[in-house]
Amino acid sequence: MVNMRKVLALMQVFRERYDHKCDFNFCDIAVSIVCRSELDFINEPGLSNYAKRRRARRLGRCVRCFRVNPGFYFTKRCDGITCVPGISWNYDVEDYIKRGRVTGDRETPSTFHGYGYPVGHKT
């Protein structure tokens, strides 16, 4: 779904800058640019530490080791300060927290219940 407000705003900028030089419709170019730019921000953008903490808090995970946070009464390995990931951890959760994107064919962070990468994923 294309955001028409963005398309119209982009068309207006094109008309203001290039209308006297060109005589074609800018609609196709604007739609193409908006579609390509929205692909990068389908999930949650941002690579800052604040963005990572925000995504981890949304999932209820630790930013450093990707374990469930707050932990259970028997949790001893995650203190949120000096913890590190274990031998194997959920790579989908790591990718979402660190980069803000969902790997594979999953679309929402609420579907992080599997283990590792989806079948057919090239690493």
Swiss-Prot record:
InterPro entries: Carla-bd. One of its GO terms (biological process) is symbiont-mediated suppression of host innate immune response. It comes from the Viruses. Keywords: DNA-binding, Host-virus interaction, Inhibition of host innate immune response by virus, Metal-binding, Suppressor of RNA silencing, Viral immunoevasion, Zinc, Zinc-finger. One of its GO terms (molecular function) is DNA binding. Residues 52-55 are annotated as: Basic. A zinc finger (C4-type) spans 62-83. Belongs to the carlaviruses nucleic acid-binding protein family. Suppressor of viral-induced RNA silencing. The potential mechanism of action is based on sequestering siRNAs. This is RNA silencing suppressor. It comes from Poplar mosaic virus (isolate ATCC Pv275). The lineage of its organism: Viruses, Riboviria, Orthornavirae, Kitrinoviricota, Alsuviricetes.
